[in-house]
Amino acid sequence: MGNVCFRPSRSHVSQEFSQSEFSTASPVRTSERPSDASLDAGLESSSACHRSGLRGPAKHSMLSLDEIGLVGAARWPDDAPGLNISNKSNTQENKRYCESLYQAARIAGGSIASGRVTSFDGLWRNATKWRLSRILSGDASKIDFATVRMPNTRFVTSLRRPYHSVIERVRNHSDANSEIYEGEYLGGIETKVYRQHGTISSTTIPMTIVSAVADDDDIHERLKSLPKNERRHLKDLMAASHPNMITHTDAVYLPMIKDHLESLYLQAIDPSLEQHEALELIARIHWWAASAAPDRRGSAAKAEFAARSIAFAHGIELPPFEHGAVPDIEAMLRSEEQFVEDYPNLFERPPQ
């Protein structure tokens, strides 16, 4: 096994670890609630947009200020004020983050429509630039948000809070199979496993693996069997070897996936597309980018940034995702076709 890299919690941070160590939230920059002027900033003129044939963003936002404050928020199923530590979408800090994503994606949509962003790689660079702008320069982990994952590194997300709601979903997933876990400390425990695959030019590639112990009592009994003085130490060590885990797409497949995203992008910026056709391609791009998780940090936010930017280029506004729908998690728990079918219904209301 190569190095183990833990995906971040939704406090806008992550870090690479060799053991079960997790970082705290890094500070983000503040900004004022957007005015009409700031929402229009950076948009291309209507004549520039016309040169590409794409409409570009509407002159004025079709979302309310409350909706803008939820664009890009990770709205976990248990995310409600005062409910538990997963709650972040209602904080002022998170609203500023969401407003920033909305404005930056709107500007990027104008750049797509004007012909200045001609590739998915260029759009991803825009997304990365925006994401880096939300991190203070003194944060030592900032470089991870601009670093592509390397092959032979096992990249995982532990299903601890705020990801714990995924456990029940994989247990009940219609395409999850029962397997016997082979980890170092919890080997032999029955586990439910969903294995995601993608297809590019008739080639099927393995992607995200989401797993969860079938019965919590099996974990508790195993821990109870350990000497008391070893339990806490082993609990920490088990974070990298635990059945409750998302194991992300092997980085060896990233070049192939990136080429596929370039092809999808060129299809998605065709000005002749009807709205439903554009949304289908946007959903495919969102699925591949989120499920691939190409960067060490920030891939989920960048995937949503890309989807919203392409929508803006077509004059389409995507509302916030509905409460309980965290888009990258929704992507990782679905096949491409299922995600495309469900995509319009994952928003609070229909895109317009």
From Swiss-Prot:
InterPro entries linked to this entry: Avirulence_B/C, Avirulence_B/C_sf, AvrB/C-like
Spans through the membrane: none
Annotated Gene3D superfamilies: 1.10.3290.20
Pfam families: AvrB_AvrC
Keyword Cytoplasm on entry: no
Keywords: Virulence
Protein's UniProt keywords contain Phosphoprotein: no
Listed Polar residues bias regions: 15-29
Region ranges (Disordered): 15-57
Stated family: To avirulence B protein of the same strain.
NCBIfam families xrefs: XopAH
Record protein name field: Avirulence protein C
Species of provenance: Pseudomonas savastanoi pv. glycinea (Pseudomonas syringae pv. glycinea)
Organism placement in taxonomy: Bacteria, Pseudomonadati, Pseudomonadota, Gammaproteobacteria, Pseudomonadales
